[in-house]
Amino acid sequence: MNSLYIASTEGGGGKTTLTVGLCLALRSRGVDAGYFKPVGVAGQGKYDDDAVFAADVLGLAEDPADLCPVVLHDNALRASGGVVQNGAMDRVVEGFQRSLAAHDLLVCEGLGEIWQGRFLRLSGADIVARLDLRALLVAKFAGTRQLDDVCYTHDVLRKRLLGVVFCMVPETRLEVVEHHYAPFLAENGIVSYGILPSDSQLLAVPVADIAAALDGRFIVGEQWSDTLAESYLIGAMSAEHALSYFERAPDKVVVVGGDREDLILAALQTPTAALVLTGSYIPTETVLRRATEARVAVISVDGDTVAAAEGLRHLFGRLRVHEHSKIDRIGQLVEEHIAVDALLEALQ
């Protein structure tokens, strides 16, 4: 049985989601699927965060250095002429063989983009060829532009590419992908194995991550920092329109000037995950009491509303699966939307 490489042409598009979800789905079918990430990026510690998360979720006993044998960091380019380059592929091969020995197959997660690592001869295409893998491309929805990416990847990987999975597809575009994109690719010899719709739960961001990204400090509610926020809204309207505006989105973060108590209190009347108060303001006791009663974290940041909104824009819009509360949802989405049995047959 062939092992599988999950490739992508864009970071944050669903590789970890699909990799972990496929491992769970294959295990439910009696296949002992393990996880492997040939090349990673240094995270909070010395190991790749995705690999650490997957190992925890899947209960893997392998040494982290085998699960992700090459970890890139800021010094990788300067070291590219030495040991990093010369021994990197050997470490990948050795780690792969040790991990595979404990499983029926490995689902291998690629870097953010399939051509990343090429300067070390460790791109997705290099690894797929060296390890004799089959590949599945994750295509994050981006309109017709993604058809270029899929066709180009097919040209590079050729018969090693089993097909594509469309990911993060908005509900309004599902029909277009199913009835236009997928048939077009089929006519060009590229199989579509499923369409993962955009999912608010998987896109949600922990309040703690929001505070960290904005360099904010909790005024109240740090104990609710694991609450997941599904979207964000900017409070910059008149008070009479605030309530109806904030009611549009549940489980949101509201970014508002710290001196706009009228808007802050309006937001607290609606389902809100956190308040981000800009301008270094400390809110009144009334606000703090209402926030505590509603179990809403209040975060103060030094910058203005525009800067805070820009910081949140970079946080939202990427699939984020490093919370265990999302694992069941990942498994459900893969079972409902991915042709796992057809994929398994193609790996035989």
Tell me what each language-model feature is:
Residues S3-R91, G95-R98, Y181-F184:
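N-terminal phosphate/diphosphate-binding loop that engages ATP/GTP or pyrophosphate donors
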Residues S3-Y5, D32-G34, V52, D104-L106, ...:
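Structural motif
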Residues G110, I195-G257, R313-Q348:
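Non-catalytic interface/targeting segments
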